[in-house]
Swiss-Prot record:
CDD domains: Hfq. PROSITE patterns: SM (PS52002). Gene3D superfamilies: 2.30.30.100. Keywords: RNA-binding, Stress response. Belongs to the Hfq family. One of its GO terms (cellular component) is cytosol. This is RNA-binding protein Hfq. GO terms for molecular function: RNA binding. InterPro entries: Hfq, LSM_dom_sf, Sm. One of its GO terms (biological process) is regulation of DNA-templated transcription.
Length: 82
């Protein structure tokens, strides 16, 4: 697994598990909003009033609606934030 994937997965998983609202900016400038429902290597399922499958290669930036604590290597991510 690549180093980039080791950063993406915990970040997206935290957003998914904590139901954090996100703004996703695409490379063409379009802004999508919702919550991360699920994700895999290539896509993110974004849920709002409808579900959208967003291809990762089309994403420029993901902005959480509130600060999130992303677990580092060796952490389970289940403990409370300090």
């Amino acid at each position: 697994m690549s180093k980039g994937q080791n950063l993406q997965d915990p970040f997206l998983n935290t957003l998914r598990k904590e139901h954090v609202p996100v703004s996703i900016y695409l490379v063409n400038g379009i802004k999508l909003q919702g919550k991360v429902d699920s994700f895999d290597q290539y896509v993110i399922m974004l849920k709002n009033t409808v579900s959208q499958m967003v291809y990762k290669h089309a994403i420029s930036t993901i902005v959480p609606g509130r600060p999130v604590r992303v677990p580092h290597a060796g952490e389970s991510g289940d403990e409370e934030a300090e």
